[in-house]
């Protein structure tokens, strides 16, 4: 499981995907979410504005699981 550190209280899923190097630009988030299976704490998610908090587990198909950690 890869750790993705954040400095704020939460991060939006679209921003997270860019930070985790799943996408190269924020503009790709919408289409990426439509085409890729993503779960947040075990539940399917496709909203790029979904807030991710410390200790959330995000599983991105083709990239593996990530853990959000506030640093």
Task: Locate each region found by the language model.
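A basic, amphipathic helix-loop patch mediating RNA/tRNA/ribosome contacts
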Residues: 12-54
